[in-house]
Structure formats: C-alpha cells, structure tokens
Design a protein with these regions (language model features):
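General beta-strand structural signal in soluble alpha/beta enzymes
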Residues: 2-4, 86, 117
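Conserved beta-strand edge residues that scaffold enzyme active sites
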Residues: 9, 90-91, 122
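Short acidic/histidine-rich active-site segments
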Residues: 113-127
C-alpha cells in the first residue's frame, strides 16, 4: 500500500496555505516541535485542527517537549489524535533513548498512541535496514499500534 504524506517544517511557522494543499493526503508530519525555534506548541495544536488528514510529530522528542511546556504530552497527543514518528536516521538522541528506556516504552504502550517508524532515507546509501527493523520489532513486541 502506498500512502501520500508531507513532512512540514515548523521553524519558522509554516505557510497558512498548507491545510488546504494537503486535503487529499493520507497524513502530515510536523517536525522538530521540541526545538526552541519551532512554532509555539499551543499555536500548533490550534493549527493542526485545520488539517483533514492524520497528523504526526516527526523528529520530536515528545518527552522533552512535554517537560518544556509542563504538559502531559501523552494525553495531549491522544486527545488530539496525533501519532509519533520514531526516526531511525541516527540524528536524533530520542530514538536511542526510546529503544533502551523501558519506562518510556511502557508509557507509550499504555497510552495507545500510534507510532510510525521513519528513516529520513533520501537515497539508497542512507537506508538503515537494521535500525528500521529493530524499531518495528520493538513496536510489535510492545503491541504499540501503527497510525
């Protein structure tokens, strides 16, 4: 099955035309919301409501994001039907942290939040099959749903 999606940068605030431009997409991924240069999280939550397709957070340490805003980020993601992307590119510490932190794994498992696995593969030499397989196997083992 082939899906159509778009990864949307949030540094700076994205264009207002995107919700309409993505009406027929299967999903959108908003990236780097844990970055201090990103769109304000409260503003993001309002803006996300304009999108008709599924939405996820990419390149984002959701635990760090929750701490930054003093929020129960898991509840907010669940209540707003937002999934999380676990990115295996090797550029994000949160990926390795999640793979080795059983407490965080249990939090996500118990929350029921869907998790996707991304790779940031732009050409075949970047394809990290082992990491993608490992992340997917962990999600299956924990019965964490896909989006």
């Amino acid at each position: 099955k082939v899906l159509c999606g778009l990864e949307i940068g949030t540094r700076p605030t994205p264009p207002e035309s995107l919700p309409r431009a993505t009406e027929n997409f299967d999903y959108v991924l908003f990236e780097c919301l844990d970055d201090t240069r990103a769109i304000d999280f409260y503003e993001f939550l309002e803006w996300r409501k304009l999108f008709k397709c599924k939405a996820g957070l990419a390149h984002t340490d959701i635990f760090k994001l929750g701490e930054r805003y003093g929020l129960d980020i898991i509840k907010i993601l669940r209540d707003n039907d937002i999934f999380w992307e676990l990115n295996t590119s090797g550029n994000y510490i949160y990926y390795y942290d999640f793979l080795t932190n059983e407490k965080k794994q249990q939090i996500i498992k118990e929350s029921g939040i869907p998790v996707s696995v991304g790779s940031d593969t732009h050409y075949i030499a970047e394809y990290r099959k082992k990491q993608i397989r490992r992340a997917n196997e962990l999600l299956q083992k924990l019965n964490i749903p896909l989006p």
